[in-house]
Amino acid sequence: MGSILFLLIVIILVLWILASCIRIVPQAYAIVLERLGAYQATWGTGVHFKLPFVERVARKVNLKEQVVDFPPQPVITKDNVTMQIDTVVFFQITDPKLYAYGVENPIMAIENLSATTLRNIIGDMELDETLTSREVINTKMRASLDVATDPWGIKVNRVELKNIIPPAAIQEAMEKQMKAERERREAIPVSYTHLTLPTTP
């Protein structure tokens, strides 16, 4: 009786170990596998088997496009105006191995790199140019971030400036200017109503 119970325990234990060694990788994901602490392989979509005790899953990587919305960053323009700009970065992991071992915290690294790149770009532009050159800034940032993140197995698809917030005094002056321009345009049709067309003799 005791030997049968022992055999059942052994069988259950073996089945449990085998089951724990089978991994199913879903669509748009990858798994970085290590053997004895060193990189062994990258698994794509499908069913895989890892050796018990000597192999382990180091990281499960999402290969879909991801979006990170960073908080506003203080930047200074060429004409010494301090403003707040927040950015949205769209990126995709192209090399799971590099992503797993390239940098400790990839998202934080992208945020710091994004802030530094933004400050460098805005530092070469004056306020008026900054406010009217969103697409130029987006393109420059995407190109710079894409090159810098390539060793981390990351491709930056696009960057968008979400908000450009100038100082309160400048923002108020801009609003007054826009209001005056709007009132001027609205006044033009009214002035024409007071014109009298000449009568034909």
Where are these regions (language model features)?
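Single conserved hydrophobic/aromatic residue that forms the stacking wall/gate
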Residues: 197-201
